[in-house]
Amino acid sequence: MKNTIYMAPMEGLTDFTFRNAYEKIFGKGKIAKYFTPFISPNKSEKFLAREIRDIDREHNNGINTVVQVMTNDAKDFIWTARMLYDEYGYNEINLNAGCPSGTVVSKNKGSGMLNEPKLLDKFLDAVFE
């Protein structure tokens, strides 16, 4: 049985420089997917310069990169997903519903979304509408 390995993100550590170095030195094709540290959509509907650098396809050439998004707002998730697909060519996006940070959870983001199943259902219904 073959194991599938995914590289989990860690904010401030696993940016494109880390992902590329890890793949070159250790991964060598063994890592199925590398997840980016989360992008947190903003009301301006634009990515920050550091986010653009991290998700730029040229900076992730040759490694299967999945962009992680942290939001509890379906509209923000949808515009982010569209932009990642249309402008950056990503066809897989990951919703962060697991971050246990107190700051994140207090905003009902990350694992905080799991505390409110009805809100999570509403979010997912809107995304997949």
PLM regions and their residue ranges:
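General structural feature for long, well-ordered alpha-helical segments within catalytic domains
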Residues: Y6, F18, D76, T80, ...
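Non-cysteine beta-strand/loop elements that form the S-adenosyl-L-methionine
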Residues: T36, E92-S101
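Glycine-rich, positively charged N-terminal anion/phosphate-binding segment
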Residues: M10-M83, E87-Y90
